[in-house]
């Protein structure tokens, strides 16, 4: 089972709000998911992002692949550098 970390669209028409979910790659975008690991609100001036770092690092270490947008959000939050350091420090 290929697992991805990707965005799920929530909110109403013209006012998107996203959840950062861990889901099977074959599941629909807004369909079944395994776990919610964060949120992303692009409408706020500073693009409010909340991330459960421990859970994201655990899923990345298990082999979950982030989507391009999620990878950018994780990089800006500093999670990808922590994952890189954790992976190559051994």
UniProtKB/Swiss-Prot annotation:
Gene3D superfamilies: 3.30.1320.10
The entry's keywords: Ribonucleoprotein, Ribosomal protein
Pfam families the UniProt entry points to: Ribosomal_S16
Any one GO molecular-function label of the UniProt entry: structural constituent of ribosome
Regions that span the bilayer: none
Keyword Thylakoid attributed: no
Disulfide bonds: none
One GO cellular component term: small ribosomal subunit
Keyword Ribonucleoprotein appears in the UniProt entry: yes
SUPFAM superfamilies per record: Ribosomal protein S16
GO biological-process terms attached to the record: translation
Similarity-based family: Belongs to the bacterial ribosomal protein bS16 family.
Protein name, UniProt field: Small ribosomal subunit protein bS16
Gene responsible for this protein: rpsP
